[in-house]
Amino acid sequence: MDPPARKEKPKVKEPVSRIEKAKQKSAQQELKQRQRAEIYALNRVMTELEQQQFDEFCKQMQPPGE
């Protein structure tokens, strides 16, 4: 009766490992999505800042009479 009990133990562990792998994959996907959103937000902020600095530079380069 021991050999069938030994066969059942790996079967019990297999679904647990599948669940863990699924959880890890899901967590990794969420992390990747969050990082991507943060990168897009940072890119937007940096682009706005660059545009502001360029506008200020253009104002400084204009002659005072215009």
From Swiss-Prot:
Cystine bridges: none
A biological process term (GO) from this entry: regulation of metallopeptidase activity
Organism: Bos taurus (Bovine)
Gene: SVBP
Protein name per UniProt: Small vasohibin-binding protein
Biased composition (Basic and acidic residues): 1-23
Coiled coil ranges: 5-52
GO CC, alphabetical: apical part of cell; cytoplasm; cytoskeleton; extracellular region
One Gene Ontology molecular-function label: peptidase activator activity
Highest taxon, organism lineage: Eukaryota
Record function comment: Enhances the tyrosine carboxypeptidase activity of VASH1 and VASH2, thereby promoting the removal of the C-terminal tyrosine residue of alpha-tubulin. Also required to enhance the solubility and secretion of VASH1 and VASH2. Plays a role in axon and excitatory synapse formation.
